[in-house]
């Protein structure tokens, strides 16, 4: 009996130690700014500072010259600025539109010369001189919060799509990890989004050609429009599409997985020159899918 009691005591002590260790490990997994939120502005300032300093020494020449519109159009697209499927207050939607217009002024008509690199974050750091950002709802640590300057991913998404349809080489791009609401356009190409966060995540492309390229952005009441222009006409066009779109359930979470494919088309003959898979994208879906969508179990 004494031996049994001793074993039970040892087991209880072991469980207490184990639980304490798990709690400690859980605390270790938390970022310092999660434990002390008041440190977040300092951390953001530090990351932006170090990121900008790092760009001065990374051997890239960043585009910073603007000019009159170049003669030849390489590609174009448009995107609706208001997503009626998001369920978000229309005030925040209008705030996002204002933020997009401010951010676009930092890079509209930027020239990307041969050998230069375009950086989204490098350019938007000067946005304050064009106006004050407004609040937009974003996802931070699993919670939706209002943050000034939010919604700029709408612009980086459009630019990334344009870059994929051009001869420019994407050298940095980060997809969103979570999709919280369906696209307003059911025919929209999936997996081409590009999240940005100054100091952490950027969208960069390099001009490895001998031609000059330029970004042109403009707006109407409903849409944001984008074009890639050049000083020389191109004999080819690039078409982006999806293949192997599927939905899977893993660890009680639903993911969308899709291949992003690019076809190169000869403009003179309208014949396909080549077709290649650029990458595969996987994103967690947190909204309810339509009942007719098949979900694979894994």
What do these predicted ranges mean?
Residues 7-26:
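Short, Lys/Arg-enriched N-terminal segments with co-localized hydrophobic residues
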Residues 27-298:
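Well-ordered beta-sheet/strand-loop patches within structured domains
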């Amino acid at each position: 009996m004494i031996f049994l009691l001793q074993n039970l005591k040892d087991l209880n002590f072991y469980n207490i130690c184990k639980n304490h260790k798990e709690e400690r490990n859980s605390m270790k997994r938390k970022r310092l700014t999660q434990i002390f939120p008041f440190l977040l502005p300092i951390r953001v300032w530090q990351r932006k500072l170090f990121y900008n300093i790092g760009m001065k020494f990374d051997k890239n020449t960043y585009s910073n010259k603007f000019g009159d519109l170049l003669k030849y159009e390489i590609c174009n697209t448009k995107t609706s600025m208001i997503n009626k499927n998001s369920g978000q207050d229309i005030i925040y939607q209008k705030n996002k539109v204002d933020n997009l217009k401010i951010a676009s002024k930092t890079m509209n008509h930027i020239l990307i010369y041969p050998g230069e690199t375009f950086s989204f974050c490098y350019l938007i750091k000067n946005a304050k001189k064009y106006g004050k950002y407004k609040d937009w709802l974003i996802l931070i640590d699993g919670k939706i919060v209002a943050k000034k300057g939010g919604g700029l991913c709408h612009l980086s998404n459009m630019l990334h799509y344009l870059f994929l349809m051009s001869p420019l080489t994407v050298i940095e791009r980060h997809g969103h990890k979570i999709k919280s609401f369906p696209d307003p356009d059911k025919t929209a190409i999936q997996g081409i989004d590009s999240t940005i966060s100054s100091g952490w995540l950027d969208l960069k492309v390099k001009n490895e050609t001998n031609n000059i390229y330029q970004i042109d952005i403009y707006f109407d009441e409903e849409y944001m429009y984008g074009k890639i222009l050049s000083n020389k006409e191109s004999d080819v066009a690039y078409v982006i599409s999806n293949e192997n779109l599927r939905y899977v359930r893993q660890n009680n979470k639903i993911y969308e997985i899709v291949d992003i494919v690019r076809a190169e088309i000869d403009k003179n003959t309208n014949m396909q020159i080549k077709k290649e898979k650029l990458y595969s994208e996987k994103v967690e879906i947190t909204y309810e899918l339509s009942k007719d969508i098949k979900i694979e179990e894994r």
